[in-house]
From Swiss-Prot:
It is found in: Secreted; Cell membrane. Residues 71-106 are annotated as: Framework-3. The lineage of its organism: Eukaryota, Metazoa, Chordata, Craniata, Vertebrata. It comes from the Eukaryota. This is Immunoglobulin lambda variable 3-1. GO terms for molecular function: antigen binding. V region of the variable domain of immunoglobulin light chains that participates in the antigen recognition. Immunoglobulins, also known as antibodies, are membrane-bound or secreted glycoproteins produced by B lymphocytes. In the recognition phase of humoral immunity, the membrane-bound immunoglobulins serve as receptors which, upon binding of a specific antigen, trigger the clonal expansion and differentiation of B lymphocytes into immunoglobulins-secreting plasma cells. Disulfide bonds join C41-C106.
Length: 115
């Protein structure tokens, strides 16, 4: 059985109004193709901020896959979804595919200044 490793940024720091705000992710997640992957990102009162998620494949620039907690940019498959509540934001990949193997990074910013 094949496994899809999803490597995660251990810490992510954001600029602007939440400079030095620390986000913590688990080191890695592995799932079988077709299964659901849930990748978490934790930070103090993260639910009061907007969370976004980037996917980065080797040798490529990061691609935004989720913004404002749960919105998908044009061209991002519906299998990518996001949520954010309390101290945890979650990126969910339903029905993972081999092409989803990548690094995933979370980022946060103050929702009161994001408009």
């Amino acid at each position: 059985m094949a496994w899809i490793p999803l490597f995660l940024g251990v810490l992510a720091y954001c600029t602007g109004s939440v400079a030095s705000y620390e986000l913590t992710q688990p080191p890695s997640v592995s799932v079988s193709p077709g299964q659901t992957a849930s990748i978490t990102c934790s930070g103090d009162k993260l639910g009061d901020k907007y969370a976004c998620w980037y996917q980065q494949k080797p040798g490529q620039s990061p691609v935004l896959v989720i913004y404002q907690d749960s919105k998908r940019p044009s061209g991002i498959p519906e299998r990518f979804s996001g949520s954010n509540s309390g101290n945890t934001a979650t990126l969910t990949i339903s029905g993972t595919q081999a092409m989803d193997e990548a690094d995933y990074y979370c980022q946060a910013w103050d929702s009161s200044t994001a408009h």
